From Swiss-Prot:
Gene responsible for this protein: rpmF
Top-rank taxon: Bacteria
Keyword Transferase: no
Organism: Paramagnetospirillum magneticum (strain ATCC 700264 / AMB-1) (Magnetospirillum magneticum)
Protein name per its UniProtKB record: Large ribosomal subunit protein bL32
Family of the protein in this entry: Belongs to the bacterial ribosomal protein bL32 family.
UniProt keyword annotations, A-Z: Ribonucleoprotein, Ribosomal protein
PANTHER family for the chain: 50S RIBOSOMAL PROTEIN L32, LARGE RIBOSOMAL SUBUNIT PROTEIN BL32
Membrane among keywords: no
Length: 60
C-alpha cells in the first residue's frame, strides 16, 4: 500500500485546495422568451440563439 514519504505541509495542502472553491453560475435572460439561460448557450425553453431559432421546439 502506498504511503506518503513526507508529511504534506499546511501551505502546500492549502495551495492545492486554492482551486476547489465553488462559483455561482451567472444566468442571462433570453431576449426571445425571457427565461433564464446560460450565456452563449441556446435557450432550453424556446431553442433560440443570437436572434434565430436553432433548435426546433415541438408544439405542445
Amino acid at each position: 500500500m502506498a504511503v506518503p514519504k513526507k508529511k504534506t505541509s499546511k501551505s502546500r495542502r492549502d495551495m492545492r485546495r486554492a482551486h476547489h472553491a465553488l462559483v455561482n453560475v451567472t444566468g442571462a435572460e433570453c431576449p426571445n422568451c425571457g427565461e433564464v439561460k446560460l450565456p452563449h448557450h441556446v435557450c432550453g425553453s424556446c431553442g433560440h440563439y443570437d436572434g434565430r431559432e436553432v433548435v426546433a421546439q415541438a408544439e405542445a
